[in-house]
Amino acid sequence: METSLRYATNSRSLKIHAKEKFPVNSKTRLQLHGELDTGAGVPSYFCAMIRYFFHEASTNLGVGLHYDKREKLRCLVRGKKKFPVITDEVVTFNIKGRCDFDQDLVQRNAKGAAEFDWNIWKFQKDQDLRLRIGYEMFEKVPYMQIRENNWTFNTNLKGKWNVRYDL
């Protein structure tokens, strides 16, 4: 099980996130994840998703259900496509999108982004680094991510930020 501690400017409380991936076959897995809000002492959300991977095309698709304490049950569809900029995939250009629907299948929330990833393996001894710069198309806002081994810092030009530590 993958677990992490997360803190964001919009929540003002520490969250504990857990994710488990169950392989169905070589290209498909069931992914369960959820989050506990330590400030309120209750779960923030729970999600169950089937993810399908097209390894030869560096593409993945996912369909699932998401239960949020505020918006109740939602349907979720997401996808991501990677394009290597350099042959060893140290630098990639990624296109990703997702759309949430309410129970009546009316569109609720769409997100889409284009981004560049630069993975620097062995930046220092026992230290890997990833730099990501992207643009969220629906919110029209640039963003960036810095990831160093277990630490991840995300921010955008609207002043939002979050930090994650993978346990």
Swiss-Prot record:
It is a multi-pass membrane protein. The chain crosses the membrane at residues 22-31, 56-65, 72-81, 88-97, 111-120, 128-137, 143-152, 159-167. GO terms for biological process: regulation of monoatomic anion transport. Its main location: plastid. Residues 32-55, 82-87, 121-127, 153-158 are chloroplast intermembrane. It is found in: Plastid, Etioplast membrane; Plastid, Chloroplast outer membrane. This is Outer envelope pore protein 21A, chloroplastic. It comes from Arabidopsis thaliana.
